[in-house]
């Protein structure tokens, strides 16, 4: 069933907005970050990873963001170009802002952490004047990242994109993507998350992220069902609440729910799965698949990523995901993720 009605004949199918960074993942893993000496550089940042993921899946992808005017910024633009992602709306920071840097720790397959450098960064300098209405008018959907709301002027730029999307019948997907950096306090988080969450068509986040978004509008923490009912009531068509290794559930505006579990894999790291999940799930929605099929596709892609060293570099193709699902079902049974 198609819960989302996308406009036809648009140049782009999806345009993420917001954070792009550089990830440094340790080569010498299974030790604390303080002991790692060798790292490999990758493109990073949830919106950027989602863009790469959807491009690998064959979608026509654009991107709205700002990068540093240096070698790292050039690396991002060149990487996107090589992936077939339109870079016409990626701006360069003019006042010396740097690209966000992320150093990851892979202490063990289940113990991973992230150290981010997010001061004076380019992506939060995206300005309202750099949001082009024609670009948003020419895409089926935009993805707004919660990190884009953390600070002005990026905050206002994201809100302008939201308003222009609603004006032009462009679908809005809100990926909550909470990162503690750059926010002043939890009330600020709740205010701006709610503004976008109340106007989006699809909202995706972890249980903890929904708790943050709802902290000013409820007295006590909600159950998943209560949160889903609330955000569907605001007008969302699909609400996805994630619980990590416990799986996730999609709630739809016809009062149905669909639960998916992770596919079994040998973990390498415990981060990166969320972006792969989002890109593959969104792919299924763009293809107007049944919700359960889209969830299964997302869960499979996430499993593949947590078994891989990078996030962006290891984003799978449609063929690779289908082969992975087929292999796991042959090994564990047809309902391995759906049971």
Swiss-Prot record:
Q: Does the keyword Nucleotide-binding apply?
A: yes
Q: Which keywords accompany this UniProt record?
A: ATP-binding, Kinase, Nucleotide-binding, Transferase
Q: Which domain of life is it from?
A: Bacteria
Which EC number(s) are documented for this chain?
2.7.1.92
Q: Alphabetically, which GO biological process terms does the record hold?
A: inositol catabolic process
InterPro entries named in the record = Carboh/pur_kinase_PfkB_CS, DKG_kinase_firmi, Myo_inos_IolC, Myo_inos_IolC-like_sf, PfkB_Carbo_kinase, PfkB_dom, Ribokinase-like
One GO MF term, please?
A: ATP binding
Pathway note: Polyol metabolism; myo-inositol degradation into acetyl-CoA; acetyl-CoA from myo-inositol: step 5/7
Matches recorded under Gene3D superfamilies: 3.40.1190.20, putative 5-dehydro-2- deoxygluconokinase (2.20.150.10)
PROSITE patterns to which the protein is assigned, alphabetical: PFKB_KINASES_2
User: Which transformation does this protein catalyse, written as a reaction?
Assistant: 5-dehydro-2-deoxy-D-gluconate + ATP = 6-phospho-5-dehydro-2-deoxy-D-gluconate + ADP + H(+)
Q: What does this protein do?
A: Catalyzes the phosphorylation of 5-dehydro-2-deoxy-D-gluconate (2-deoxy-5-keto-D-gluconate or DKG) to 6-phospho-5-dehydro-2-deoxy-D-gluconate (DKGP).
Q: Which family does it belong to?
A: Belongs to the carbohydrate kinase PfkB family.
User: In its UniProt entry, what is this protein called?
Assistant: 5-dehydro-2-deoxygluconokinase
Organism of this sequence: Clostridium botulinum (strain Eklund 17B / Type B)
Q: What is the lineage of its organism?
A: Bacteria, Bacillati, Bacillota, Clostridia, Eubacteriales
